[in-house]
A protein has these predicted regions:
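Catalytic-site beta-strand/loop segments enriched in glycine and acidic/polar residues
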Residues: 1
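Divalent-metal coordination cores built from histidine and acidic residues
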Residues: 7-102
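Residue-level signal for inorganic ion chemistry
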Residues: 10, 128, 155, 204, ...
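Hydrophobic alpha-helical scaffolding
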Residues: 23, 27, 131-132, 179-184, ...
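Conserved beta-strand segments of alpha/beta enzyme cores
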Residues: 48, 151-153, 249
Length: 253
């Protein structure tokens, strides 16, 4: 996939703007890599595009320049596709101290890592956005943080709303994603918080091919950018996916 095909698929699915993740080749952790991506997007994109910068211990000195070209800084606190995991305190402190205060810091954080992100938000008084939340313990902790006035927001994906670990045997490698699918109880918790704690629904689109997913070493992630999988209907608390209009479990009779 490239900016041409990816944005065309987004438009086919009813989306007019995409936010591209930084775990690309090359990763968007330097001003040079960001400039390259911006140039390619300008020449090929069919809809509006914004780019995430990536946090990297080796490129901390690039944060100021990256802030001028990107919509937000994304910090990976857990393993996912690519090699952008940040697991040392000095790098985290540098990111929160040096990233422009007018820009959001987004985090891929799972389980106890969410507590790390909330703590950093409190210490540095900064807006932290948690990407693709998938567990009851995570969403309840974020709800507690919001009730205390901390500057945190979060999102959930269609696959974490509509699939669980029970679907694993049926999906095989196509059900392998990061964060991994939760339990049925986790799914229920996400629906319970959809109209209050959760700020938006996002695809976490990962454009791996069928051949890649069926290989001996399938990459995690699923392509959700252009198949009509996402169209939130916030007023009624329903979400439209390829399955049709879906009500929250507690709304069903």
């Amino acid at each position: 996939e490239d900016f041409n095909t990816g944005t065309a698929a987004a438009l086919a699915g009813g989306m007019t703007k995409i936010l591209a993740k930084p775990n690309k080749s090359p990763p968007l952790t330097t001003d040079a890599a960001m400039a390259l991506a911006v140039g390619v997007a300008r020449r090929n994109a069919r809809c509006d595009v914004a780019l995430f910068a990536g946090a990297s211990p080796e490129d901390i000195d690039q944060l100021a320049a990256l802030g001028e070209r990107s919509i937000a800084l994304k910090i990976y606190l857990n393993d996912t596709f690519g090699k952008l995991r940040v697991d040392d305190v000095p790098t985290l402190r540098a990111c929160f101290a040096r990233w422009p205060r007018s820009k959001v810091i987004a985090m891929h954080a799972e389980k106890q890592s969410v507590a790390v992100g909330i703590g950093l938000s409190a210490v540095y008084d900064r807006h932290v956005h948690f990407c693709h939340i998938s567990r009851r313990e995570e969403i309840e902790l974020i709800a507690d943080a919001k009730q205390r006035g901390l500057k945190v927001t979060c999102e959930v994906t269609p696959h974490h709303l509509f699939l669980s670990q029970e679907d694993g045997p049926r999906l095989g490698p196509f059900g392998d994603m990061r964060p991994i699918l939760g339990t049925a109880d986790d799914v229920a918790a996400l629906w319970q918080h959809l109209n209050n704690t959760i700020d938006c629904v996002a695809t976490d689109h990962a454009p791996h091919t069928r051949a890649e997913k069926l290989s001996a070493t399938p990459p995690p992630g699923v392509p959700l950018g252009g198949n009509g999988a996402l169209s939130p209907h916030a007023g009624s608390g329903h979400v439209y996916t390829h399955r049709g209009w879906q009500a929250r479990p507690d709304d069903e009779e």
